[in-house]
Structure formats: structure tokens, C-alpha cells
Amino acid sequence: MMYKLAPLHCRPWTLLGITPQLIESHYEGNYGGAMRRLNALTSEIESFDLATAAPGTLNRLKHDQAVALNSTLLHELYFASLGGDGRAVPEPLAKALERDFGSVSRWRQEVIALAEGMEGGSGWVILSWVPRDGRLINQVGSDHTQSVAGAVPVLAIDMYEHAYHLDFGTNARAYVATFMRNIDWAATLGRYEDAIKSAAPRPLYQKEFADVPAITPEEVKALIDAGTVVQIVDARPRHFTTKSSEIMSGAVWRDPERLDDWINELSKETPVVTYCVYGFHVGCQTAIALRAKGFDARYMAGGHYAWKAMGGRMEQLDQS
């Protein structure tokens, strides 16, 4: 299984006091880097030879995979948390915060105290819903090593020594074998059936472009790797091309404001992929304009920075 990048949800140029450069670096380097590590580790685990590997090797890989997975999940939540004005809490959520923290103000104070208490360290402050207790909590995550965000456990083996020492001494292997023979699969099935009813995170998309066909960076790469001919148009506004000397390998830059000047360079017999900086308006609008002219055009979700975050090949942009 290969994990896929989520397009950047917030619009970096609209944030107050946070520069687009910070968001770009964070998304491309940190989130993209975590996604690349996650996929590399997942690939290594899937091809892992259990018969010949040294003891503990798989444990290390699974630990590192969990860290990378948590990093991607939390970064996606972080970017999805940005983009509002930060002032008015919607009434239903305000009532929930008042119920669980005493007041919205108290909740804010606690979040700030937790965040400031991590100064110079590393980790996360997370507002979480605990289904078992039916309440919200503030959670501190040390690095990325807490349990997977949003996961609902259905089976667990306690490997602390207190779980087996009285019967098995230090023979953990015998304990595990005995545990496996004592699993209540009917109860486990019940928990599984309950877990799959949990709603997945609400998909993030631009409502104004909901009907425009999109393609993910991973899907574009798969087409290229398969040798499929695709016309890739870098439709970043001209002023963005002066800020970056890189372009997606195999793409051509064309001014989105002068579409009529270059549209005849494209073939209606070959699929077209357009992209802009972040995968918002310009790439979508260019795809819409091309589709109106009879082209099989889609926009690449996440745009230039999603391609870079995925580790897609880049080349120098010819500015001549």
C-alpha cells in the first residue's frame, strides 16, 4: 500500500502573520518528507523476510512507520486547521468546549499553556474527541510517537512484563502463543464492525470547483512511469515563475492569462494535466477553459508544491 499526499487545504497567501514561504517549506519539506519516509518504510515492510531478519528489525521498522504515519496525519490536520479568522467559535463547538473545559476562554488558556510549555522541545498539542467518554480533551503528543491519530483499537496485546510474569516468567514467546489461543474473535469482530461505522474525516475540497475533474500527483506519476503520453501545462501565474527556477519534469510553462495564444500547441487527442502553485483557482480555471474548448483536461490537486512534496522529478525552468 502506498500512501498519497493530501493537497494543501489552506490558502497560504490569505494567512495573517504567516508567510507563504513558511507554509511552502513546511508542506514540501516536513509533510512531504514524512510522506516519502512513510512510503519507503511501508515498501520495506511489505517485502520484509520474517524468516531471515535479525530479531527486533521489524519492530524498529514498524515503530518508524508509526512515527511517519502520525506525522503525515497530524500535518494534514494542522494545514486543515489554518485559514479562518480564529475569533468566533461556532455555537455547537463553543457549547462543547464550555461543557468539557468550563468555558471557551479556559480552553484557550489551556491550549496556550500547553503550547508554550513545549517551547524548545518537539511534539503536538491536539484537541481530541474521546468516543468512549463522549468528551473533548487537549492532548500533548511527544514527537510523533503517540497512538495513531483517530484510530479505533479493536485488539490489543499487553506486552508489559506485568501481563505475563506470574505465569510465564520471562518466557514472552510462550505468553504470546497462549494469548493467540485465547482471542475472543466474536468480540473482536463486534469491535471491528463498530469501528468501521466511524465517520472518516470530511473530505476537503473547493466547493466552487467540485465538478472539475482532478488528478492526484501520484496518478500523474503513474501515467508518466507507464509511458502514457500526457500534455502537462504549468499554469502558474508569471510572477510565481520568477520566484522559483524549478518546473515539473516534462511540463511546459504557459501564461494562464494568454491561453488563446498557446492553446493550438495542444492536441485534443492526448490528455492534458494543468497545475498551478497550490492547486487552487488558476490550475482549475485553466482546466475548465481547456475543457470548454474540447480538450480532455484535468487539474493536478495540490499543484506545484504537492508534486515537490511527493518527491516528483523537477528540472530547471527555461526563463528565456
Which residue ranges define each predicted feature?
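Short active-site oxyanion
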Residues: T228-I232, S249-G250, P271
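Feature for soluble, non-membrane regions of globular proteins
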Residues: M1-L204
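Catalytic cysteine-centered active loop of the rhodanese-like fold, especially the PTP/DSP P-loop
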Residues: D260-A309
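Short amphipathic alpha-helical segments
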Residues: K243-E246, T286-I288
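Flexible, polar/low-complexity N-terminal or interdomain linker segments that lie immediately upstream
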Residues: A195-K243, D318-S320
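Short acidic-hydrophobic, aromatic-tinged amphipathic segments that line or gate anion-handling sites
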Residues: R254-D255
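Short, structured coil segments at secondary-structure junctions
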Residues: I247-S249, K293
